[in-house]
Amino acid sequence: MIDKKILQMHFSRNAKNYDAYAKVQKKMANTLLDMLDLDSKSRLDILDVGCGTGYLTKLLLDRWPDARITAIDIAPGMIEYARDRFNESNVEFACLDIEEAELNQKYDLVISNATFQWFNDLGGTVNKLVQSLKSDGVLAFSTFGHMTFSELHFSYETARRKLKIDEEFPPGQKFCNAKEILKICCETFEGLEGFEFDTVKKESLEYEYFYTVREFLDSVKKIGANNSNKQRKVNTALTKEMIRIYEEMFKVNGLVRATYHCIFITSRKKLAANTRRLVNAVV
């Protein structure tokens, strides 16, 4: 269970560091944008969920300068930092938890980069987002999959078994695999009567390299993405052994590796074929 207060604190206090360290997240934002196929001639209504510093918001504005963009984030520090970067009247920022917020507007595009892993109720949130789409609107998001930080999790479990520690408080966030995420999405889509969805999934692995494990862990903290689970405990002996194993197993040419498993999903909401026939008959 994600503790949202801890999450807010982590991201708020690291807003100024984020863009300097979030190299993978920036690459994901560009990949997600490249997957979109929307009419650039019309004025779009866009919701940017988990906008952070506004990096993706800026990409959206560059592509659709006339779009009306609502950018939201749970962290006040992120919203404050993002607001200072934009002067455009067609971009509005709000500090909101999307899992708690009510969406009273319909959007052509609901987009979210590297945020879905922080939701406690993924299915409920996906349902809320697709309900807010206009007909022919698109939900597009990227998130992290189960192979993310696989080196860290392997080293932690190996150290825990070696030291015979029964308690399980992993050092990093655990992530769903792509099949689980897609299944949740498809079950949600199937529950929306009168609509069908064209869905595309893409996966990739990205790697970062560091001189030490502590440098890697520090880089995660610098973007506020360290563990926000409740009941997080620190065992000094376990941490020390975990780092030793990590550097022994995953250090090549003087550098340790960290894996990011990136998942991208886009889905277009359309009137179902039988609904379209009914609409045409009425017309």
Curated annotation (Swiss-Prot):
Reaction catalyzed: malonyl-[ACP] + S-adenosyl-L-methionine = malonyl-[ACP] methyl ester + S-adenosyl-L-homocysteine
EC annotation from Swiss-Prot or TrEMBL: 2.1.1.197
Record InterPro entries: BioC (IPR011814), Methyltransf_25 (IPR041698), SAM-dependent_MTases_sf (IPR029063)
UniProt keywords, alphabetically: Biotin biosynthesis, Methyltransferase, S-adenosyl-L-methionine, Transferase
Domain of life: Bacteria
Keyword S-adenosyl-L-methionine on entry: yes
Family to which this protein belongs: Belongs to the methyltransferase superfamily.
The protein, known as: Malonyl-[acyl-carrier protein] O-methyltransferase
The species this protein was found in: Acetivibrio thermocellus (strain ATCC 27405 / DSM 1237 / JCM 9322 / NBRC 103400 / NCIMB 10682 / NRRL B-4536 / VPI 7372)
Gene for this chain: bioC
